[in-house]
Amino acid sequence: MKKQDFEFLINLLRQNAGWEFDEEQYFIIDKKISNFIREKSYPSVEDLVAELKVGSRALIAQVVESMAFSDTSFCRDYDVYEQFKDVLLPRIIDNNRSGKKLRFWSLGCSTGQEAYSVAFALKKKLIGIENWDIHVLGTDISSLAIAKAQKGLYNNFEVQMGLNANSILEFFISEGEHWRITPDIYELVEFRRYNMLDRLTTNVQYDVIICRNVLRYFAPEYQEQILARISQVQTPNGILYLGKNEQVSVIDKFYERINGFDCAYMCKNVGLDRPRLHDISTTSGSESLAMPSFVRPNMLSEKRPFAAEAFKAGVFKK
């Protein structure tokens, strides 16, 4: 790839996704763009860049999505996950017993493993909170990643990344060479496409936002914009999780590190007097995160006759 084409592409990614690349990451861009032009049958990178310069929004969106990072796994960083499940989550539950409502947001969720892992932890702690209003939202810039997350279907390699045999059998149903998320877990989680540079209009308040190994790819000014936005939709003393050893220089403006907890920060709730806007679950036709809900895949198949009863029970509310 020519230097001018590389520079054009990294500027394109910066403007449309906020990601910061430099010359040391040339091979990452080169590999991803080579896969894209092969998949889309472009003769060369130069031909693709020439078309991008015309300004096709649809093509720009496709290129940006093809560059999205998808490194994820279930129960990622086991020590961090166990600390969340066994220490922080019980405290969050205790603090919400009066309202009986919990909201979680996996931001930059890729193909859904992180959001489902939150649901796994909740499932383990459901004794006494079975009738609570519980919802886990997962968002990502990649529509392909979101489509996979919505299916809740993973191959053998994917489920073995972070899960032991007992957990696989507890949270999945075997379908040939794949594993499908069980209905009781699936009903807790919703996925939507969201570009982290887009405005965010919602009056939903999140108890926990998980944004692990995502902000490190953004330019510093975009990191600050994103943290300012998400801190505005957190509950008082809401929790933010970053990646293990992830350093974000502007984090202290909006969050403070929780002593004794890896990667966990408490929201300072700067500017809580801001006006509340639309509820994410009811607003449509917006350029913000508030998008029309997706149609869930049919999970009531003949192969799984017990699934219908699980859905009819209606234990979990959106």
Where are the regions that the model predicts?
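Conserved beta-strand signature within the Rossmann-like core of class I S-adenosyl-L-methionine
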Residues: 236-244
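Conserved AdoMet
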Residues: 2-105
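Conserved SAM-binding loop of SAM-dependent methyltransferases across substrates and taxa
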Residues: 111-129
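Core SAM-dependent methyltransferase catalytic element
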Residues: 253-317
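Extended basic-aromatic, gly/pro-enriched interface segments that bind polyanionic ligands
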Residues: 127-210, 214-218, 222, 248-249
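Conserved class I S-adenosyl-L-methionine
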Residues: 100-114, 135-137
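A short glycine-rich, Lys/Arg-flanked "PGG" loop and its adjoining helix->strand segment in the class I
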Residues: 224-236
